[in-house]
A protein has these predicted regions:
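Single conserved hydrophobic/aromatic residue that forms the stacking wall/gate
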Residues: 2-13
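Non-catalytic positions within long, well-ordered alpha-helices that form the structural scaffold/packing
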Residues: 15-16, 66
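Glycine-rich, proline-tolerant flexible connector loops at the mouths of alpha/beta enzymes
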Residues: 1, 19-21, 174
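Polar low-complexity intrinsically disordered regions
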Residues: 165-180
Length: 180
């Protein structure tokens, strides 16, 4: 049985407000949320994404996060393609993969790796646009938003060009799944 509902109050309030997913920064809270969802205290359709800030990057950690209730997992951002592929082989939930990073936390850009990320790791959510702001969690301006959209377009263009077999879900479609 999970600890008292006090930790969950913001989660239940958010769901009633229309929010259907949370980024979770703590493994213990992830377990509490999973248990609350299983007991019906949170709706079954409430999704939990594990944050890259948790710092996981190995298959054993990913399996644990999946078992703790993560519906998708963000690995640490600087893993090689073979390392990412090893994570995919371990879990069935979608991976959230960063294709770029703010200058304040590494500043890498992996646009040309995006097609291979999709090929090796699908189902994935490609996360892009972070390199357009100076640091993580900083407020974005309208200009940053335009740059982020441009960066997302470039990533999509690379995937379409170098891995045209990739299937992109349309807005409103079901979540990505491992193919049978």
């Amino acid at each position: 049985r999970p600890p008292p509902i006090y930790k969950l109050f913001p989660s239940t309030t958010l769901f009633r407000s229309g929010i259907r997913g949370l980024i979770v920064y703590d493994e213990g809270l992830l377990w509490v949320l999973k248990e609350a969802r299983a007991m019906g205290e949170l709706p079954a359709e409430m999704k939990f994404k594990n944050s890259a800030h948790n710092g996981q990057g190995n298959p054993a950690s990913f399996k644990l996060l999946e078992d703790l209730g993560a519906d998708s997992i963000n690995p640490v951002r600087d893993l090689s393609i073979p390392m990412l592929a090893a994570l995919r082989q371990t879990v069935n939930v979608p991976l959230d993969l960063h294709t770029d990073n703010p200058p304040g936390s590494g500043g890498f850009i992996r646009v040309y790796e995006a097609p291979e990320m999709v090929r090796c790791c699908a189902p994935v959510y490609l996360k892009t646009g972070n390199s357009c702001v100076s640091g993580h969690g900083q407020l974005t301006t309208a200009s940053n938003g335009i740059d982020m959209a441009r960066q997302a377009h470039i990533v999509l263009e690379m995937v379409n060009r170098y891995y045209p077999e990739a299937i992109q879900l349309k807005a409103g479609e079901a979540e990505p799944q491992i193919a049978d």
